């Protein structure tokens, strides 16, 4: 029973970490990366469609993304969707493809992004601590129902705390990597 609680807590913490990685990948660094455009939806035949289903996105070099649109009639819609996104990008179409040069980040913008990244990381830590609280509550419930002893309860809480510490370290490591990536010029 305790093992199930610990395993559940660990799985939920892992999901929180994956969600945080997803949030971090959406935050633009100085480098071109195809995942930068993941959240963009393109109106395609009257239906909002994810950009990656309408075009192939590749990083041409460290400052340029190249898109190959599958249906040439959708090029204007793709360009418009990219311009309307809050990424501040200006796509240029050339024949059947679209190139997106990424402007270098200003020092002020980098600091703003670092602030955003730190807030996201803190949200990840809070989510992990909430999972710990839930797991410890489940252990306390078992103790109240006399299904486990106090020693087992204490040991389980220590295990849950060590799992929590491990995931908090992973969040801090992700944050440090992202900050370093953002500060590279």
UniProtKB/Swiss-Prot annotation:
GO CC term (a single one): cytosol
One GO term (biological process): cytoplasmic translational termination
Assigned protein family: Belongs to the RRF family.
Major subcellular site: cytoplasm
Protein's job: Responsible for the release of ribosomes from messenger RNA at the termination of protein biosynthesis. May increase the efficiency of translation by recycling ribosomes from one round of translation to another.
PANTHER family registered for this protein in UniProt: MITOCHONDRIAL RIBOSOME RECYCLING FACTOR PSEUDO 1, RIBOSOME RECYCLING FACTOR
Listed name of the protein: Ribosome-recycling factor
One Pfam family cited in the UniProt record for this chain: RRF
Species of provenance: Alteromonas mediterranea (strain DSM 17117 / CIP 110805 / LMG 28347 / Deep ecotype)
Superkingdom: Bacteria
NCBIfam families on file: frr
CDD domains: RRF
Molecular function as annotated in GO: ribosomal large subunit binding
Record keywords, A-Z: Cytoplasm, Protein biosynthesis
Designated gene of the protein: frr
Cell location: Cytoplasm
């Amino acid at each position: 029973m305790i093992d199930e609680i610990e395993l559940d807590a660990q799985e939920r913490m892992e999901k929180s970490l994956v969600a945080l990685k997803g949030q971090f990948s959406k935050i633009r660094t100085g480098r071109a990366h195809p995942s930068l455009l993941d959240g963009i939806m393109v109106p395609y035949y009257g239906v909002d469609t994810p950009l990656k289903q309408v075009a192939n996105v590749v990083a041409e070099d460290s400052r340029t993304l190249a898109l190959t649109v599958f249906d040439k009639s959708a090029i204007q819609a793709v360009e418009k969707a990219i311009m309307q996104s809050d990424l501040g990008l200006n796509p240029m179409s050339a024949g059947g493809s679209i190139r997106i040069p990424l402007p270098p980040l200003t020092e002020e913008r980098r600091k703003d992004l670092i602030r955003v990244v730190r807030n996201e990381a803190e949200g990840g830590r809070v989510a992990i601590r909430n999972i710990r609280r839930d797991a410890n509550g489940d252990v306390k419930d078992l103790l109240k129902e006399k299904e486990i002893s106090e020693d087992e309860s204490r040991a389980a809480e220590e295990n849950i705390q060590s799992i929590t510490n491990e995931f908090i370290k992973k969040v801090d490591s992700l944050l440090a990597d992202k900050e370093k990536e953002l500060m590279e010029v």
